[in-house]
């Protein structure tokens, strides 16, 4: 009985990913990199395509294609944009029952900021989670590092 209860508890806990980094770039610079969805395939590991479906000053709907080890999926999010401060994502379409999260950019000085990335997600079913779960978790867990490396490439060249 205890094993069964433990199994049920494991089933209802959604995977969460949280990453934080202190970077020698402004909040504005980091916000611009993260909000530049169309450039994702150039530097995000596993990202094979991205497109903006709708865009207004405070909101963007974008689709991102991810592929790894022969497994490909597309997901679409609606992003609430607070310029140079935060990007809040919510699921529109994709292999998830739930996907919410976002980015927060906190200035530390003119040339440094703290970036925070948080994601809560749950796949639509166990089969999709078995096929794609590890790939997606790995991609999501490496997002902050990928953007930090990208910032160095883009802003150190100036």
From Swiss-Prot:
SUPFAM superfamilies: Bet v1-like. It comes from the Bacteria. GO terms for biological process: cellular respiration. Keywords: Stress response, Toxin-antitoxin system. The keyword Coiled coil does not apply. The keyword Heme does not apply. InterPro entries: COQ10-like, COQ10_START, START-like_dom_sf. Residues 70-158 are annotated as: Required for resistance of nitrosative stress but not persistence or toxic effects. GO terms for molecular function: ubiquinone binding. Disruption phenotype: Deletion of the pasT-pasI operon yields a defective infection of mouse kidney but not bladder. On rich medium operon deletion decreases bacterial persistence after antibiotic exposure about 100-fold. Forms small colonies on rich medium. Delays growth on minimal medium supplemented with threonine, increased sensitivity to oxidative and nitrosative stress. Growth defects are complemented by low levels of PasT expression. Toxic component of a type II toxin-antitoxin (TA) system. Binds to 50S ribosomal subunits, preventing them from associating with 30S subunits to form 70S ribosomes. In this strain of E.coli low levels of PasT complement operon disruption, however high levels are toxic; their effects are abrogated by high level expression of cognate antitoxin PasI. Associates with 50S ribosomes. This strain of E.coli has only 6 recognizable intact TA systems, whereas E.coli MG1655 strain K12 has at least 16. This may explain in part the differences between the 2 strains. PANTHER family: COENZYME Q-BINDING PROTEIN COQ10, MITOCHONDRIAL (PTHR12901:SF10), SPERM PROTEIN HOMOLOG (PTHR12901). Belongs to the ribosome association toxin RatA family. This is Persistence and stress-resistance toxin PasT.
